[in-house]
């Protein structure tokens, strides 16, 4: 059974690609984007082609390491191995397991992802949990110097800005400093 504590632990334990001191921010940025939208009442699942690809690519270009190319399909697909993420319409994708299919397949087959039903219900029942998870992600994966900017950018990418989400994240962050 899902609880706040088990979800917090699952978020803390997400697998992150690392090379030396470098860490990939892909999964944390995707989770922050999804949580911001849940805060505003978004449905459980996000269509990769219309709701995730471009938005996450923008976040990766702004807050990710300098690279020739970013691959927002990687965290979208690979989060399913972290115990709380669900994907739908994957049966026609050429790849299964942890290796992600090409972006074209995710779009063509309308692959959608988001928190699984049990954890989504928990977030809907306890809206304060969304803010505390966002704070947890910001603190664990982003330097203090860009945490506020990261929260702002995620809000700007959303079509309808919810100023309360940013305030909750910042308030939660300052309480734990």
Identify the function of each model-found stretch.
Residues 4-151:
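Short helix-coil boundary/hinge micro-motifs
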Residues 133-176:
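Short, charged surface segments at domain edges that flank catalytic/cofactor-binding sites
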């Amino acid at each position: 059974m899902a609880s706040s504590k088990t979800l917090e632990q699952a978020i803390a334990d997400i697998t992150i690609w690392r090379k030396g001191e470098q860490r990939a921010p892909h999964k944390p940025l995707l989770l922050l984007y999804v949580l911001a939208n849940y805060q505003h009442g978004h449905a459980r699942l996000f269509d990769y082609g219309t709701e995730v690809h471009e938005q996450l690519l923008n976040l990766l270009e702004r807050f990710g390491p300098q690279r020739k190319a970013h691959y927002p399909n990687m965290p979208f697909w690979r989060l399913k191995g972290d115990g709380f993420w669900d994907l739908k319409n994957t049966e026609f994708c050429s790849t299964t397991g942890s290796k992600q299919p090409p972006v074209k397949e995710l779009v063509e087959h309308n692959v959608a992802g988001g928190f699984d039903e049990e954890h989504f219900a928990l977030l809907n029942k306890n809206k304060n949990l969304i803010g505390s998870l966002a704070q947890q992600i910001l603190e664990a994966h982003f330097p203090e110097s860009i945490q506020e900017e990261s929260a702002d950018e995620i809000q700007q990418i959303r079509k309808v800005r919810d100023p309360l989400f940013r305030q909750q994240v910042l308030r939660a962050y300052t309480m734990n400093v």
